[in-house]
Amino acid sequence: MTSLSDILASSAEAGLSLQRSDGSMPAGHNGPYHDPETPVRNTSHWLVTFLKAHELTDENRFRQAASDAVSYLLSEEARPHGHTFEHRQNDTKDRCNGLMGQAWSLEALALAARALDNERAAAVAADVFLSHPFCDKLKLWQRVDTDGTILGFDRTFNHQLWFAASGGLVAHTAPQEVSQRVRDFLDSLPSTIDLYENGLIRHPLRPSMDLSELAESVTHDVHRSMVRNHLLHYLRPPRSKRRLRNKAEGYHSFNLYALAILAREFPSHSVWSTDLLSDILEYTLSEEFREATTDNKFSHPYNPPGFEVPAAMETFSVGSYKEREMWVNEQIQHSFDPNTSLLTRGTDDKQTHAARLYEATRLDDYEIYLD
């Protein structure tokens, strides 16, 4: 028997030998999407783990590793045009990985800015966040590619949610405008989030719009993409709808984790006392959800529900300690390799999954039962 803090420290130790001289960490391929990625994403994740390892052990080598990771994220290689972070190099997709890629890097820089008292990290994080156009009407952000090109709304809900969560972290050392945009997003969350009948969060972004708003949006260059999502909601064939539901089941815990971050940063916001959140949490605690995460390629092998669900349970004070501990142990049993101290089992993207242990840094220190 060991503890989660021991797992984090030992994995950070293993991570030290993976870090390159420029501070970067090995790149993966975005899990099931198989996108050629730059080191930016995994360096962002490992940065958080190194910070946690320093907090746990007070060993300077972890602080230095975190500092080196920050240096890489602030380098020209990570932001080649001085705009957004370059996360992937797939010629058929954007290089910023929508809002999602930026959220991961902003999350890491925001935490490092405070832990390392790094003013440049704070300034860059605020600058990149605010460079993304925010729609005052829909309370949503547009994507900005690495060369500064504005690409329109990110039409995936979890990307918008995670970008808001990263903004909540950035807000600690940023202009008031950052916090205000996140609060505006939270104010509109009940009309932005879309649920299945059982409380499962839908994957596509489909904000509530009446017929007049939809008609008006058709003539608006930026808003038109939201009309597309509304049309697709009704026109998708059954097979496509089943695939999307399976994806939503694999991403439900990922959404929960972002909601938990936001709730910790804005604990008094009224959205946390709505029926909306109650419905989401009720589904999360159901046996139906547990079964849905089994053999789902977007779940344990990619998004780690064993860290994400307990984070939400802790934050919103639901479920028992034993249930949370069970989720954590299930993820460790599935993914942790005790021989390497890395989260590399049961996945075809070992580099990315190893980096995603960072999500456990926000959890209580649970007992871990290794085989």
Curated annotation (Swiss-Prot):
Query: Which pathway, metabolic or otherwise, does it act in?
Result: Cell surface structure biogenesis; S-layer biogenesis
User: A GO term (biological process) for this protein?
Assistant: S-layer organization
What are the alphabetically sorted keywords of the record?
A: Cytoplasm
- Give compartment(s): Cytoplasm
**One GO cellular component term noted in the UniProt record for this chain:** cytoplasm
Kindly give the SUPFAM superfamilies that the UniProt entry links to this protein.
Six-hairpin glycosidases
Q: What happens when the gene is disrupted?
A: Defects in N-glycosylation pathway, characterized by impaired addition of the fourth sugar of the pentasaccharide: both dolichol phosphate, the lipid carrier used in H.volcanii N-glycosylation, and modified S-layer glycoprotein Asn residues only present the first three subunits of the pentasaccharide.
Q: Which InterPro entries match?
A: 6-hairpin_glycosidase_sf (IPR008928)
Q: Where is this region: Disordered?
A: 19-39
Q: What is its main location?
A: cytoplasm
- Presence of the UniProt keyword Transmembrane helix in the record: no
Main function: Putative isomerase involved in the N-glycosylation pathway. Required for the appearance of the methyl ester of hexuronic acid found at position four of the pentasaccharide N-linked to the S-layer glycoprotein. Either involved in preparing the third sugar for attachment of the fourth pentasaccharide subunit or processing the fourth sugar prior to its addition to the lipid-linked trisaccharide.
What is this protein's name?
Answer: Archaeal glycosylation protein Q
Source lineage:
Archaea, Methanobacteriati, Methanobacteriota, Stenosarchaea group, Halobacteria
